[in-house]
Amino acid sequence: IGPQRIICMTEETTEWLYLLGQEHRIVGISGYTVRPARARQEKPRISAFTSAKIDKILALQPDCVLGFSDLQADIASTLIRQGVQVTIFNQRSVAEILSMLYQVGAMVGQAQQAMERIAAMQAQMQAVALAAAALPRRPRVYFEEWDEPPISAIRWVSELMGIAGGDDCFPELAQQSLGKNRIIADSLDIVRRDPDIIIGSWCGKKFRPEKVAARDGWQNVKAVQHQQLFEIKSPDILQPGPA
């Protein structure tokens, strides 16, 4: 049932299809794929994030190409004009991520297994939220997706921080899907919001807490004073999928 020759232009659909035991359907993956590690050995890499090897994709004769967001619209348009079936997801929230997971599962005849795995994820998030509700206070959290210029948390990250018991310092920016619309032009805006915790995930670049702490005017930020600066690896938090 469903497509037999799938190309995954982003990492999360590759990871999900492997978890569902449907990796035999995958004929091409993103060059950024890290999970599962064996995917990089088993499958040809055909795309970055905003670029793809169109000729190589066409040569693989896919019956479905899976992509993510408006940033891959040009690639999708080119493939569609070549007669390729393309499905682009645009998940930005936790609910939309779970919906995407169900849709991909159903597409490959694994709706029941997808539902069971999604239910387990929901139960885990509910357990975390319940534990967080018992905390004495909700810390203010600044999540930095990039450092030059500073870019704050995308919506699903903001929501996950809330589930874990924190409050996003920039909740109004989290609603903006594009990174350019989450740029904080004046870094002193971050200082004024005085986060208790700073989490960095610099899109694959190593987070440098000492560099953040040394920024002009940041010495009085609570997170800096109390050394509450942490890194979450980008593949673990910035891929809108099962991770």
Put a short name on every predicted segment.
Residues I1-A243:
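N-terminal ligand-binding lobe of clamshell/alpha-beta domains
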